[in-house]
Amino acid sequence: MKYFIKKFFNSLGFEIKRLNPQPQIGSDKRPVGQMDLLLEDLKFRGLKCQLIMDVGANRTYWSRMTKRIFPTANFCLIEPQIEMQNDLEIFCKEFPNSIFFLAGAGEKEDTLTLTIWDDLAGSSLLPLPNNKLENEGKQRKINILKIDNLISSGKIKMPNLIKIDVQGFELEVLKGATKTFGDTEVFILETSLFSFDDIPGVPSIADVINFMLERNYVIYDFPGFLRRPLDGALAQCDICFVKQNGFLRRSHKWK
């Protein structure tokens, strides 16, 4: 009977497979490339978060997912696009001890030009100012804050985990967050495998890895991958960095 049922559904273009349960949290069977699974595993291995910082918070999707995994953590959201203000306000109203800043982040406090993409997800600070784009509403001036100043002024506590997804501006954000190195346990950074023509100046994946290694942070996991539409080549990946001598790397055993 099973054979005939499978044949019937195959003839309709469907394939029947047995659903495999998700491997146990923290096991070596967990798939690579899934952000939520990495966060669950970090928590399982002992990561405790009082404050999580989301730089490039966009519509708060990542923060909402992370809040489900670390329900007692407070959040600091940094996002420069006015279109996201309502989402940021809703998040902070729903989770009252969280805070948001409607600004970008960089090496110093400043005013810079943000180039807006149609999907509002790929907006970047890297392209140079262009009068034509500004007149078309595709560029605008935004305020830039420095994360070190947020910490030293007491506006936020030291984050335990920082995620940065800012379309090639990650290293500039980190240059303004020097106080976090050595204290923040985990960084999750978007990196690129190409120097894209449409966003000039994107740091290479090697640049990001070396920058973090110089500050005693090493690769721990890869929670996300993205192929480019042009030809399907792997173009971006999220890298989880942890302290080189931190508790997450306490053991160097294989088994």
List the predicted regions and their residue ranges.
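Phosphate/nucleotide-binding beta-alpha loop and adjacent structural elements of enzyme active sites
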Residues: 1-255
